[in-house]
Amino acid sequence: MAKTLTIIDFMQKFSSEESCKTYLADQKWGDGFVCRRCGCDHAVKGRTRHHRRCGSCRFDESATANTLFHKIKFPLPSAFAMVHLLTTTKKGMSSCELARQFGVHQETAWFFKRKVQLAMKACEEGQQLVENVEVDETFLGGREEGKRGRSKGSKSLVLVSVEVDYSDMTRRKAKLKRCRASVIENASGESLKQVLEASVEASAVVTTDGWKGYLSALTGKWHNVENSAQGANFEALHWHIFNLKNWVRGIHHHVSRDHLQSYLHEFNFRFNNRLKMGQQAIQVLATMAISPKSSYLQLMAA
């Protein structure tokens, strides 16, 4: 079992620019050096101990260059601390609060947080929900008078799937293991199928309400249909949806439709890695160290 990494341990480990750059260099070039200009795999000592110089074209590259830490506008220890807070605290932190705590502009904090969300997404990719899965849709966004049911109006429609454990428990108190939340255009069978095929293992037993879209989306799958009974038959799932909505309202107050999926990636990652005792921060840092840099426009489109 991995040792618990407390905030004190983390800050001592990454207390200086030197320690942060050493970690990033180890992650970035741990499997070998490849020059991103000419493709040569031979490196010599660079300008500093955290640089590598191509043995062929002599291009000098730093530990942060072409990573998600590329040209950040504040000290690396602060950036590492932000990653720890965003990954390990129960509800994360808004960009406004990050800006206040670390003394940076809100736009700077928001831009860096989007990079962290991108790494969180990468950490979760390819990890499908297995065994018993419950699925339902919900809306995230403002109210709109007269809109009911699956007519979303100006709201964003989100498909929420949870992997549940029924062992030694009544169905009402099923234990939630992992989750996925994805923005969908509508509740048609085609939209549902696209998301469910990507997020749920083909052999899983999927339980939904009687919405017709699920019937076509899950054709050929092990599919249970249950009446929602105003939430009584999906109590654990609906508590999870309730917590998701409270997180958006309470921490961020409002998330635009354009950026909602990135915040759902953050929510998914933090929930799915909640038992890693601080090690999830290291996982995200390692991913950021090997991920290519992203411009503002690229992050806006991600």
Regions found by a protein language model. Give the residues of each.
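Residue-level recognition of single "structural anchor" positions
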Residues: 1-302
